[in-house]
UniProtKB/Swiss-Prot annotation:
Keyword list, A-Z: Methylation, Ribonucleoprotein, Ribosomal protein, RNA-binding, rRNA-binding, tRNA-binding
UniProt subunit comment: Part of the 30S ribosomal subunit. Contacts proteins S8 and S17. May interact with IF1 in the 30S initiation complex.
Protein name, as recorded: Small ribosomal subunit protein uS12
GO CC, any one term: small ribosomal subunit
One protein family per Pfam: Ribosom_S12_S23
GO biological process, one term: translation
NCBIfam families from the UniProt entry: rpsL_bact
Record flagged with keyword RNA-binding: yes
This protein's record includes keyword Ribosomal protein: yes
Length: 124
């Protein structure tokens, strides 16, 4: 335990909290332009072709973003909205594209969990 005199001379160091999503710069979402749209394979033990895109953000960062849902309409030069949220089995992918915003369309024929995939309520 430090004495009061020691604490007066050199106070306790504050713990620095490191962000999981530095490119967002404390914003909820950021806009960016797709520079490359491609598929990649996950870590073991999973197997798939995960849809991802490389995005140049408005603040100059270039990040890799996951495209959730079945099927998408993104290509190079598409303008997308990025939110935080990593993909556990894709190393280096720390962002998600927001479906149903800007150039990224919602998922077709989605009935449940629609809000996560940018789908309006169906006419019943």
């Amino acid at each position: 335990m430090a004495t009061i005199n020691q604490l007066v001379r050199k106070p306790r160091a504050k713990q620095v909290v490191k962000s999981n999503v530095p490119a967002l710069e404390a914003c909820p979402q950021k806009r960016g332009v797709c520079t490359r749209v491609y598929t990649t394979t996950p870590k073991k033990p999973n197997s798939a072709l995960r849809k991802v895109c490389r995005v140049r953000l408005t603040n100059g960062f270039e990040v890799t973003s996951y495209i959730g849902g079945e099927g998408h309409n993104l290509q190079e030069h598409s303008v997308v909205l990025i939110r935080g949220g990593r993909v556990k089995d894709l190393p280096g992918v720390r962002y998600h594209t927001v479906r149903g915003a800007l150039d990224c369309a919602g998922v077709n024929d989605r009935k449940q969990g629609r809000s996560k995939y940018g789908v309006k309520r169906p006419k019943s």
